[in-house]
């Protein structure tokens, strides 16, 4: 499938996301698997110097950016950082001017803000999946994230 854009009727999209990093910090990658009906799209990318948490966030941001119209999206992630950030911490960070409960600046704030903006375009449900536990979508996203690491390493 060339483009998984979503239709104007709020198409249902299932999305699996993952991030990987060798060194943490070090070369990292992100991967996304999206399915809508019979259509499927995969994406990956990477950075030469990054962290695992940044790559986890980038996977979701890039997956949502690829949807050109508002959709109903179920995001499957093995990242507690992303899951808790979006379902527990985000509202308080925003209320405190992007500060934690300890009054420290939120780490990766520009990525959290970008993710918040993308989530606002869609109806999003969050699902946590255990990593490396046989979930086929998560395993594919993990493989894509590792492709992103290799691309960042220049291989």
From Swiss-Prot:
It is found in: Cytoplasm. Pfam families: RNase_H (PF00075). Coiled coil: none annotated. The keyword Disulfide bond does not apply. Its cofactor is Mg(2+). Binds 1 Mg(2+) ion per subunit. May bind a second metal ion at a regulatory site, or after substrate binding. Belongs to the RNase H family. One of its GO terms (biological process) is DNA replication, removal of RNA primer. Monomer. One of its GO terms (molecular function) is magnesium ion binding. Residues 9-150 form the RNase H type-1 domain. It catalyses: Endonucleolytic cleavage to 5'-phosphomonoester. Keywords: Cytoplasm, Endonuclease, Hydrolase, Magnesium, Metal-binding, Nuclease. Endonuclease that specifically degrades the RNA of RNA-DNA hybrids. The gene is rnhA. Mg(2+) 2 binds at residues 18, 142. Its EC number is 3.1.26.4. GO terms for cellular component: cytoplasm. It comes from the Bacteria. This is Ribonuclease H. Its main location: cytoplasm. Mg(2+) 1 binds at residues 18, 56, 78. The keyword Secreted does not apply.
């Amino acid at each position: 499938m060339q483009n998984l854009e979503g239709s104007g009727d709020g198409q249902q999209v299932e999305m699996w996301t993952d991030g990987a990093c060798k060194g943490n910090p070090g070369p990292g990658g992100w991967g996304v698997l999206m399915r809508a009906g019979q259509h499927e799209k995969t994406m990956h990318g990477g950075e030469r110097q990054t962290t695992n948490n940044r790559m986890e966030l980038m996977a979701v941001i890039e997956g949502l950016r690829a949807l050109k119209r508002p959709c109903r999206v179920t995001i499957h992630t093995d990242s507690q950082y992303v899951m808790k950030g979006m379902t527990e911490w985000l509202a308080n960070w925003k209320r405190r001017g992007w500060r934690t409960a300890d009054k420290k600046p939120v780490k990766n704030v520009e990525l959290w803000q970008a993710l918040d903006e993308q989530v606002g375009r869609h109806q999003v449900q969050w699902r946590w999946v255990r990593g490396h536990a046989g979930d086929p979508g998560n395993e594919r996203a993990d493989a894509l994230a590792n492709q992103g690491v290799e691309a960042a390493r220049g291989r």
